[in-house]
Regions:
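Membrane-anchoring hydrophobic segments
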Residues: 1-35
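A conserved amphipathic terminal alpha-helix motif
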Residues: 236-260
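Beta-strand/loop substructures that line and gate deep hydrophobic ligand-binding cavities in soluble
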Residues: 208-237
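Membrane-interface segments at or immediately adjacent to transmembrane helices
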Residues: 107-183
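Membrane-embedded alpha-helical segments of integral membrane proteins
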Residues: 25-79
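Short beta-strand segments that buttress and anchor functional surface loops
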Residues: 200-205
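Short secondary-structure junctions
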Residues: 184-192
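Internal/C-terminal transmembrane anchor helices
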Residues: 82-112
Length: 260
């Protein structure tokens, strides 16, 4: 008759094999979720996925990753407690992958909750710069170039710091400086009209390849000049602060250029 200690020893390899299999499955699921999240943006950018499908893929990947993170952490503790080091290491790998998959979308979601639900930001809410040259490029885009009072109200509350820049140089010099800064931003310059003191450009986001259109307007202001800017997304309801960040970055560089 086999006594209890001998039976435990006999079952140990089989039990360890089962734990390793479970840990391997968790790793595979975590890797699949990470891959789905990574491919969602390029999938939309190259026309394989629609916008809704791409966003939904990220949402589901992040949700599943959050669940797998908990499973992997519990699995790590249990496997280590039972002395199954290899299975524990696999669970650690799964936890790391799940953490990297779930954290960025979660941060973006929380950030979006505290930002205005707008996709159009300008330094002049009373008389925003108007698009001209980029209009043909916006055919079929979901978002209109019409600036509404509802957008202005949300911008005032969410981005009170967005304001025009005053330069102590004539308008044509301000235009030249603005054009130089615009080129340094890596945007595709669509038009630079010195006669109208207007610059238009398009910025493309890295992951999804979203197109955001920019217009910069320069006006005389006494002995100096005033520079206004507008940044508008072609698709999407909320831009998660991207357009406001772009306007701030441009204006800061323009002011730094003046200081030098």
């Amino acid at each position: 008759m086999t006594n209890a200690p001998e039976k435990v020893l006999a079952d140990a390899p089989e039990l360890g094999h089962r734990w390793t299999n479970v840990a391997s499955i968790v790793v595979a699921l975590a890797a699949a979720g990470a891959l789905a999240e990574l491919l969602a943006g390029p999938g939309y950018r190259f026309g394989v996925l629609g916008l809704g499908a791409g966003i939904q893929a990220i949402r589901w990947a992040a949700t599943v990753a959050g669940i797998l993170l908990v499973v992997a952490l519990v699995g790590t503790l249990m496997a280590r407690h039972r002395g199954m080091r290899y299975a524990a290491n696999l669970f650690v790998v799964a936890a790391a992958i799940s953490l990297l998959t779930s954290v960025p979308p979660t941060i973006l979601w929380f950030r979006g909750k505290n930002l205005p639900n707008i996709h159009d930001v300008t330094t002049d809410m009373e008389n925003p710069p108007r698009y001209v040259a980029v209009l043909p490029l916006r055919k079929g885009s979901r978002n209109s170039t019409e600036y509404t009072g509802a957008v202005a109200a949300q911008q005032r509350q969410g981005y009170p710091d967005i304001a025009p820049v005053m330069l102590e140089v004539p308008a044509i010099q301000a235009f030249q400086r603005a054009a130089g800064v615009a080129r340094s931003m890596g945007w595709d310059i669509v038009a630079a009209e010195p006669g109208e003191l207007r610059i238009e450009a398009t910025a493309t986001t890295f992951l999804f390849g979203f197109k955001d259109d920019i217009v910069i307007r320069v006006q005389s202001n006494g002995d100096g000049s005033r520079v206004d800017m507008r940044s508008l997304s072609r698709v999407g309801g909320s831009d998660f602060g991207v357009n406001a960040s772009r306007v701030r970055s441009f204006m800061q560089k323009l002011m730094a250029n003046q200081a030098t």
